[in-house]
A protein has these predicted regions:
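PLP-dependent enzyme catalytic core of the Aspartate aminotransferase-like
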Residues: 2, 110, 124, 299-300, ...
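Short Gly/Ser/Thr- and Asp/Glu-enriched loop/turn motifs at secondary-structure junctions
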Residues: 125-127, 393-399, 442-444
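N-terminal small-domain helix-loop-helix segment of the aminotransferase-like
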Residues: 8-135, 192, 356-359, 472-474
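Conserved core of the PLP fold type I
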Residues: 90-237, 249-277, 289-294, 305, ...
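PLP-dependent aminotransferase class I/II
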Residues: 275-280, 284, 289, 293, ...
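Conserved PLP-binding catalytic core of the aspartate aminotransferase-like
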Residues: 373-374, 387-427
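Hydrophobic residues in well-ordered beta-strands that form the structural core
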Residues: 156, 178, 244, 352, ...
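Helix C-cap/helix->beta junction micro-motif
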Residues: 237-238, 387
Length: 474
């Protein structure tokens, strides 16, 4: 799964969509929108009808396939409810700037500068360069509408967030191109990215962007600044946009390696003037070595974009608040238009701004949330370790990436599906995980376990069920 779908599969999909469009009076775009965003959606809905409940439904399903954080949600809800009480109808009931009220963008700019990027290259984040939408997904949808055209491709280091394929394709007609690194924990380097572009050339109109996520979903690792810059430098020198998704930036629970936001990158970083980067520039330069500091500055001003949101770090996936930071004035102008279709409701903007302005509360909450994430991660991985289940060491986000390939008869996607089905269908297991194939991993047998959306007892039950199944799986 490290390349685009085979031609035969694409032809079958096209025929199916054409038939669906004709039968149900849909456009081809509407027909494609009827496809589920990932393969396990049916299982999710089924599991939610019979969830595990201690004492009342002990044989219920445990869902560890959704990247949500409910561990500290009560703290957030209490503070937001307090903020909502002071919202004034005359300031929140009418139209406002569709890409975010002035107050919300100022609050977000201050928060992002203080928490995500204290060493921001410009000294401050300009609120006028922030574009707020109803969640990071809407931000990405709008952004790629402005920087790509139907038939274009976007490079994404794999494994990656399983909904990216749908997020790029369903409205904008853009294809995700998975690119594997040297191992599951590494970002691809210049040669691997070059090969991915060459392989996609015959199928796509062009490759327009590189989409990075740091910290990683599904791995839960924090990529080093140097690794991120290697990939970004290559793309910027090739004339591509670089989009950095940082929605897990404040969800670190182990201080393994410091998270460095792309908001802190400088033109010198992108150019590679630091002597420590010299080897990386030689190996991954892309576009030749004739770049100047002014070229790097211009590339950052027009083609480097950072996505952030409150869904993950603030246990607020239902509140739908995401933000784009870009220096490209024309993208901001386009967002003024398209943000109308997905703007955040006025009362929510008011409440979120008030909460973010309460810096003492924010700091205490983030500390509490990190502790809760750390405890949940430790509880899950301790049981997996007892069962000799290999995992990628993670330090951020809400995921554990497990490798169950040793329990498969063969290293095939069919065997991965059989193991995934056993986890879900076995009456003693009834566990829903994200299959690695949906994350476009290149090795069958790996799964994502999301540990922050269920209570501790359910999490531990799920881990023990998995270990028990693996002992008897054939």
């Amino acid at each position: 799964m490290s390349e685009l779908e085979p031609a035969a599969q694409r032809a079958d999909d096209a025929a199916e969509m054409a038939a669906l469009a004709e039968t149900h009076c849909l456009s081809s775009r509407g027909a494609h929108a009827t496809k589920p965003p990932f393969s396990y959606l049916h299982a999710f809905f089924r599991a939610m009808q019979e969830p595990y409940e201690p004492g009342t439904r002990e044989d219920g399903y445990v869902v560890l396939a959704v990247a949500q954080n409910f561990l500290t949600v009560d703290t957030v809800q209490r503070r937001l409810a307090l903020a909502m009480r002071s919202a004034q109808p005359e300031t929140t009931a009418g139209y406002d700037n569709m890409r975010g009220s002035d107050r919300l963008r100022r609050a977000l700019a201050a928060h992002m500068k203080r928490v995500l990027a204290p060493n921001h290259a410009d000294g401050a984040i300009d609120p006028d360069r922030l574009c707020v939408s109803a969640g990071a997904g809407a931000v990405i949808d709008n952004l790629f509408m402005t920087i790509t055209s139907p038939g274009d491709g976007v490079l994404i280091p794999a494994p990656y967030y399983p909904a990216f394929d749908n997020d790029l394709r369903v409205r904008n007609g853009v294809r995700a191109i998975p690119v594997a690194g040297a191992d599951a924990e590494s970002l691809p380097t210049g040669p691997a990215l070059d090969r991915a572009v060459e392989e996609a050339a015959a199928r796509l109109t062009g490759v327009r962007a590189l989409l990075l996520t740091n910290p990683s979903n599904p791995l839960g690792v924090v990529y080093a600044k140097r690794s991120m810059l290697c990939a970004a430098r290559w793309a910027l020198r090739e004339g591509m946009h670089v989009v950095v998704d940082e929605v897990y930036a404040s969800s670190e629970y182990y201080d393994v390696g410091p998270f460095v936001s792309a908001l802190e990158w400088t033109p010198e970083d992108v150019l590679g003037e630091n002597p420590a980067d010299a080897a990386d520039v030689d190996a991954d330069a892309g576009g030749g070595s004739s770049w100047t500091l002014e070229d790097a500055r211009r590339a950052m001003a027009t083609r480097l974009h950072v996505v952030y949101g409150l869904s993950k770090d603030f246990c607020a996936s239902g509140y739908r608040v995401g933000v784009l930071s870009t220096r490209n004035e024309q993208i901001v102008r386009a967002m003024d238009n398209v943000a109308y279709f997905c703007c955040v409701p006025g009362p929510m903007q008011f409440a979120v701004a008030e909460v973010l302005e309460d810096e003492g509360w924010v700091d205490a909450f983030l500390e509490e949330n990190s502790a809760n994430l750390r405890d949940a991660h430790a509880a899950l991985t301790a049981i997996l370790a007892e069962g000799n289940v290999p995992v990628v060491p993670s330090s951020a986000g809400m995921f554990v990436w497990v490798d169950l390939s040793a329990h498969m008869k063969a290293p095939t996607w069919e065997e991965e599906k059989r193991l995934w089905t056993a986890c879900f269908e076995d009456e003693k297991t009834r566990l829903l995980m994200t299959p690695g194939r949906d994350c476009r991993h290149n090795k069958p047998g790996c799964f994502r376990m999301c540990f922050a959306a269920v209570k501790r007892e359910a999490l531990e039950v799920a881990a023990r069920r998995l270990v028990d199944l693996l002992k008897r799986y054939e």
